[in-house]
C-alpha cells in the first residue's frame, strides 16, 4: 500500500519536531489507494510537489539531536549533582533513537513521532565551538540544560470514526476498545462500536505474534544464510538484470540519473526524477540502484543486499516514469490491492474505509488483524521479481530456495519493511499531522503498532501475486484469499501458542507483556468477571433503595440491564399462533445438591445446561439434547412438574423454552434440527452403550443419531392407541400426535413426551419461571450472561471457530430430514462451504445469542395451554434481590450483602 523507503540515520523522522510536520492539506496521497494506476504513472507520481519535506525535517531533527547529545554528555561529565530525572543518565538520545544504520531490530521500543519540548526551547547555545575552551563552567554556560523527561500527558487514543465522527472513549467504553486505541496509532472507519470492538479484539489477540514475526525477520537479515537474506540479495540481482540493457535509458545520461538517485546532481526538467519525492530513499538502496543505472557490474555490498525489497520498489517507480510499457502492462495485469473507496488514513478525516474490500471482509471473518487492506506495495515487489525473472530466463526465487521458502522470505522482508522502517515512520508523522484537524492530541506508540499492513494483508498480497491469480477474477481472488487468510491465522495462532508455552517475560514493559499473554479465552473470562462485578455493584445499589420505584430505576439505569430485562414477547405470540416449542427442564447434578447451597456441585443448573448445549463437557460427547414438545392445543407436563418419580434434582426448577427461528437469509440446513421422538418418553440414555463408544469417532453426527435411534427402538412404550410402533421424525409430527392424544383425553394433563435432537444455545428463547421466582431470576441473569459470552466467543475466534464449525458439521451431515452422510463426505461439504454462506450463518447465530432470553409462565387451561411473558420489573423487590443474590453466591468468593462492598469474583 505504501510506497515509502526507509532512511538510514532517519533521526528526524523518528522524533520530528512539531513545527516541521507537513500540514494535512499538503499531505501527499499514496498511490495504492487505487487498484491500478493510470498508464504511465508509477506509484510515486501520485505525490504532490512538496520539496523534500521529510528530508528537510530529518536534517533539522538530526541537528537538534546532536545538540542535545552534546549537552547531555557535558552535563553528565561535569555536573556535580546530576538530577534524578535526567533522561540521559543511563542512555544517550542517539542510543534511544537507534542512529546506527540497519539497527532497527535493536531498538524495538522506539516511540514514533515523540516530541520533546526541550529540543525547541534549547536551540540556542549550540553554535559555539566547544573546543575553544577547556573550562567546564564555560562549556556549561554556552550550552542549555540537557533535555529532561517530558511529564506524561493525558492518555491519547488512535483515531476511530463511526458514521464519519471521531469516536471518543469514556469510562463505560469496553476495555478491549480502550486498550486497542491507546496502544496503536491508526485512523480507520468502523460501522459501529461493536464493529470497532471486533477489529480491536482481533488486533489485541494477534499483535504479539505479529511483533515476533517482524522481530524474527529483522534478525534474519543479519544472517547471510537465512531465507530472507538470500531472497533479498536475489532481488537485487534480478532488478539489476533489467536495467543493464534497458532501451528506455538510451535517451538519458545514465551517469546523470545515477547521480540524481544519489542526490549528487539536481534533476533537470527532462529527468524522470524531476518530480520530487515525498520521502528520501535509503542510502543503501540509492547506492545500489545508482550502480544499476550507471551499468556498473561490481558486487553489491553487505548493506546493499539487505534492501532488495526497496530496490524493486524503486525499479517499479522508474519504470512508470520512463513509461516502459511492457513492464507497466505486466504490473497492471498482476497487481493486487485493497478497495479503500478513495480514502486514506493520512488524508481522510473520516478514516480509512475498508467496508467494500473483500480481503478485509475475509480477515474479519477469521478474526485476524486488519490495518490497511491487501498490500499493493508487497504485490509490486513480487511483480518486479517475476518480470525480471521472466526476461532473464531465471526463477524469481533465490537459487537455493523452494517457491514456498521464497514466498515466506518475501513476507518477512515486507513485514520488516512496513513495521520497522520507512512506512511506519512516515505514517506516524502524517497521521499525527492529520490528528490536529480531528481534534486529537499528538500520539506516540511503538513503531510496530503504527497501522501500515498486517501479516495477513501482506501474506495475502504476496500469495495472490506469486500464484498468478488474475485481479480481475473477483471470485477466484475471494476463494484464494479465504485459504491464504486461514493459513495466516494458523501461523499467528502457532506463534502465540509457542510464546505462551515459553512463558515470555519481558524486562522492558511488564504491562505489554501481561497483555500479550492474555489468550482470547482468558480475555473473555476477564470480561465475564467484570460483568459479574457490575451485577454485584447493582446489587449494592439496590440494597440502598428505599422503595420499589427506586429499585427498578436502579435496574433500568444499570449497564447490565440487558441481562435482567428482555421485553420481546415473541415466544407467546408464536405459541398462540400454533407453533410448537421445545422444553428442557433444568436440573441439579444430583438430588443432594437441591437441598444444599445453590451451585454447590460446581455448576448451577443454568451453567450445566449451557455447557451441555455447547458441548463443553470433557467427559461426554454431547450428540443430542433430549427435550419435550409442547403446543397450544395440548396441555402437557414438563419434567420439573413430574410427580412420579419424585426427584428433588429437577423438582420445581425453571425450564428453558427453545424455538428454531427460520430466516430467509439462512439455508435450510441451518434451521433444521433433525431427530426422532415419541408421544411417550423413553430411556434415551440407554443408547450410549459400549458398542456406541467403540464406533462414534468414525461416524458423522447424522450417522450417530441413526445408530442411537436403532438402539432405542426396543424402548418405545406400548400404547394400544398408537398408530405406529416407530419414532416420529419431525417436531410438527410429534405435536400433531400430542394433539390427537389430548383429544382422546380432553380432561387429562399429558405426561411429558420425548424428542431426541441436538439443540443449540441460540435456540433458547425464554425461561419458564417454575416454582421459585428468585431461582428464575438467577437463571435469567446467568443464561443471558452465557449467551452474550458465546456471541463474543464466536466473534473473537472468527467465524471459523469451534462453536460454528461443529454446528455446521452436524447440520451438513444430514441429507434431507433423515438420510445420513458419512464423515468424509460431510467434511468435504464443510470445507467447500462458500465464504458468504458461512458468514451469514455465523452472523445470524450471534444475532440470536445477543437477543438473549426472557421470562415467562407456562399455563394450562381448558383449551390447552398458553405462554405468558413476564418482565423482571413486575417481580417484587424481595424476589429480584434474592435472585441476584443467588446468582452472585455461585460466582463470588464472599457472600454478598445488600449494601456491602463489591467482592472478588471466582470465575
From Swiss-Prot:
Keyword Chaperone applies: no
Biased segments, Polar residues type: 1-11, 124-136
Region feature Disordered, mapped onto this chain: 1-47, 116-157
Transmembrane spans: none
Keywords: Virulence
Official protein name in the record: Avirulence protein A
Gene from which this protein is expressed: avrA
Domain of life: Bacteria
Keyword Hydrolase part of the UniProt annotation: no
NCBIfam families (alphabetical): AvrBs1
Amino acid at each position: 500500500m505504501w510506497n515509502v523507503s526507509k532512511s538510514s540515520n532517519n533521526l528526524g523522522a523518528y522524533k520530528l519536531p512539531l513545527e516541521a510536520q507537513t500540514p494535512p492539506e499538503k499531505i501527499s496521497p499514496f498511490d495504492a489507494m487505487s487498484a491500478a494506476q493510470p498508464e504511465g504513472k508509477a506509484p510515486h507520481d501520485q505525490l504532490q510537489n512538496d520539496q523534500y519535506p521529510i528530508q528537510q525535517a530529518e536534517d533539522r531533527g538530526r541537528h537538534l539531536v546532536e545538540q542535545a547529545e552534546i549537552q547531555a554528555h557535558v552535563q553528565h561529565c561535569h555536573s556535580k549533582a546530576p538530577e534524578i530525572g535526567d533522561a540521559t543518565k543511563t542512555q544517550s538520545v542517539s542510543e534511544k533513537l537507534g542512529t546506527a544504520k540497519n539497527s532497527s531490530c535493536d531498538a524495538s521500543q522506539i516511540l514514533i513521532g515523540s516530541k520533546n519540548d526541550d529540543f525547541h526551547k534549547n536551540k540556542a547555545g549550540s553554535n559555539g565551538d566547544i573546543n575553544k575552551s577547556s573550562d567546564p563552567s564555560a562549556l556549561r554556560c554556552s550550552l542549555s540544560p540537557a533535555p529532561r523527561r517530558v511529564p506524561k500527558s493525558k492518555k491519547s487514543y488512535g483515531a476511530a470514526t463511526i458514521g464519519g465522527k471521531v469516536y471518543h472513549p469514556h469510562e463505560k467504553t469496553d476495555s478491549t476498545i480502550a486498550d486497542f486505541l491507546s496502544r496503536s496509532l491508526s485512523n480507520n472507519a468502523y460501522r459501529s462500536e461493536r464493529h470497532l470492538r471486533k477489529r480491536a479484539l482481533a488486533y489485541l489477540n494477534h499483535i504479539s505474534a505479529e511483533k515476533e514475526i517482524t522481530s524474527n525477520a529483522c534478525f534474519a537479515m543479519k544472517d547471510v544464510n537465512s531465507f530472507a537474506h538470500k531472497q533479498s540479495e536475489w532481488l537485487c540481482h534480478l532488478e539489476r538484470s533489467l536495467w543493464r540493457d534497458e532501451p528506455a535509458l538510451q535517451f538519458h545520461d545514465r551517469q546523470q540519473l545515477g547521480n540524481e538517485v544519489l542526490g549528487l546532481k539536481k534533476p533537470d526538467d527532462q529527468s524522470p526524477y524531476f518530480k520530487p519525492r515525498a520521502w528520501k530513499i535509503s542510502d543503501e538502496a540509492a547506492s545500489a540502484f545508482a550502480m544499476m543505472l550507471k551499468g556498473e557490474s561490481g558486487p553489491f555490498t553487505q548493506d546493499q543486499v539487505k534492501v532488495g525489497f526497496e530496490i524493486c520498489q524503486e525499479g517499479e517507480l522508474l519504470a512508470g516514469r520512463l513509461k516502459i510499457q511492457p513492464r507497466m502492462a505486466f504490473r497492471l495485469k498482476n497487481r493486487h490491492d485493497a478497495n479503500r473507496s478513495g480514502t486514506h488514513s493520512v488524508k481522510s478525516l473520516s478514516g480509512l474505509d475498508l467496508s467494500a474490500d473483500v480481503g478485509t471482509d475475509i480477515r474479519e471473518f477469521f478474526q485476524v488483524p486488519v490495518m490497511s487492506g491487501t498490500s499493493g506495495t508487497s504485490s509490486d515487489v513480487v511483480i518486479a521479481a517475476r518480470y525480471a525473472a521472466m526476461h532473464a530466463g531465471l526463477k524469481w526465487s533465490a537459487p537455493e530456495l523452494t517457491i514456498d521458502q521464497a514466498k515466506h522470505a518475501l513476507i518477512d522482508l515486507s513485514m520488516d519493511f512496513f513495521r520497522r522502517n520507512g512506512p511506519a515512520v512516515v505514517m506516524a508523522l502524517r497521521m499525527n499531522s492529520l490528528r490536529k484537524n480531528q481534534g486529537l492530541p499528538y500520539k506516540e506508540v511503538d513503531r510496530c503498532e503504527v497501522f501500515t499492513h498486517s501479516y495477513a494483508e501482506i501474506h495475502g498480497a504476496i500469495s495472490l501475486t506469486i500464484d498468478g491469480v488474475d485481479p480481475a477474477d473477483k471470485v477466484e481472488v475471494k476463494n484464494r484469499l479465504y485459504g491464504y487468510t486461514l493459513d495466516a491465522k494458523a501461523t499467528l495462532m502457532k506463534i502465540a501458542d509457542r510464546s505462551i508455552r515459553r512463558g515470555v517475560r519481558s524486562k522492558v514493559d511488564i504491562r505489554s507483556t501481561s497483555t500479550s499473554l492474555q489468550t482470547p479465552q482468558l480475555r473473555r473470562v476477564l470480561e465475564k468477571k467484570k460483568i459479574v462485578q457490575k451485577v454485584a455493584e447493582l446489587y449494592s445499589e439496590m440494597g440502598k433503595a428505599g422503595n420499589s420505584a427506586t429499585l427498578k430505576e436502579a435496574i433500568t439505569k444499570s449497564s447490565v440491564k440487558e441481562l435482567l430485562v428482555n421485553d420481546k414477547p415473541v415466544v407467546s405470540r408464536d405459541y398462540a399462533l400454533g407453533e410448537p416449542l421445545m422444553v428442557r427442564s433444568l436440573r441439579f447434578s444430583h438430588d443432594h445438591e437441591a437441598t444444599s447451597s445453590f451451585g454447590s456441585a460446581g455448576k448451577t443448573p443454568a451453567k450445566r445446561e449451557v455447557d451441555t448445549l455447547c458441548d463443553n463437557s470433557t467427559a461426554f460427547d454431547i450428540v443430542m439434547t433430549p427435550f419435550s414438545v409442547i403446543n397450544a392445543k395440548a396441555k402437557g407436563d414438563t419434567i420439573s412438574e413430574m410427580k412420579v418419580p419424585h426427584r428433588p434434582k429437577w423438582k420445581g426448577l425453571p425450564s428453558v423454552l427453545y424455538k428454531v427461528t427460520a430466516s430467509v437469509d439462512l439455508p435450510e440446513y441451518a434451521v433444521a434440527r433433525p431427530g426422532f421422538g415419541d408421544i411417550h418418553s423413553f430411556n434415551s440414555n440407554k443408547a450410549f452403550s459400549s458398542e456406541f463408544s467403540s464406533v462414534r469417532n468414525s461416524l458423522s453426527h447424522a450417522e450417530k443419531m441413526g445408530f442411537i435411534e436403532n438402539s432405542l427402538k426396543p424402548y418405545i412404550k406400548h400404547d394400544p392407541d398408537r398408530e405406529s410402533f416407530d419414532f416420529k421424525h419431525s417436531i410438527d409430527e410429534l405435536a400433531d400426535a400430542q394433539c390427537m392424544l389430548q383429544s382422546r383425553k380432553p380432561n387429562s394433563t399429558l405426561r411429558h413426551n420425548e424428542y431426541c435432537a441436538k439443540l443449540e444455545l441460540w435456540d433458547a428463547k425464554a425461561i419458564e419461571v417454575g416454582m421459585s421466582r428468585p431461582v428464575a431470576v438467577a437463571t435469567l441473569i446467568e443464561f443471558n450472561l452465557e449467551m452474550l459470552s458465546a456471541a463474543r466467543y464466536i466473534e473473537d475466534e472468527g467465524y471459523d471457530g469451534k462453536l460454528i464449525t461443529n454446528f455446521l458439521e452436524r447440520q451438513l451431515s444430514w441429507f434431507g430430514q433423515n438420510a445420513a452422510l458419512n464423515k468424509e463426505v460431510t467434511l468435504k461439504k464443510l470445507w467447500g462451504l462458500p465464504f458468504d454462506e458461512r458468514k451469514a450463518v455465523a452472523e445470524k447465530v450471534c444475532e440470536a445469542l445477543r437477543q438473549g432470553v426472557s421470562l415467562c409462565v407456562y399455563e394450562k387451561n381448558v383449551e390447552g395451554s398458553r405462554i405468558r411473558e413476564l418482565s423482571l420489573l413486575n417481580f417484587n423487590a424481595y424476589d429480584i434481590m434474592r435472585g441476584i443474590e443467588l446468582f452472585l453466591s455461585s460466582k463470588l468468593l464472599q457472600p454478598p450483602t445488600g449494601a456491602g462492598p463489591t467482592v472478588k469474583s471466582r470465575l
